[in-house]
Amino acid sequence: MANNSKSELEIVAKYSLEMWKLLRAFERALSDLPDDKKQRRTAQFRYSSSRLDGLLDEAGLRLLTFDGQMFTANLPVSPLNADDVGDPHNAIIESTIEPAIVGQNILIHTGKVILAGGVNVSRD
């Protein structure tokens, strides 16, 4: 997709973002499955995740998550709960709500994160 326009990349990025959210919801639901079904569904999750990564790679895009990292202003994310955290620039990213999506030297989508120590925001 090296020759594709920015709008085509944005469409692929939006679709990938929705697929990523669906995969995360599926991953959370795995813990509720009985053991006899969990192994097969976990394999399906891993396969779908690797396919998404492979397709994004073909398009020249990457999904970036920042769970557990120190929040800094230069990260391509927006903290949803920055007002609820004492000093957001000394906070750890608790979870990624939406990943950042980047192409070659271009930010396609700014990610959304929750900082540790703030009010919990629903992921649904």
Question: Could you say what each language-model-derived stretch is?
Answer:
Residues 1-36, 47-50, 54-124:
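Extended, amphipathic alpha-helical stalk segments that mediate dimerization
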Residues 42-46:
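Short, charged, amphipathic alpha-helical segments
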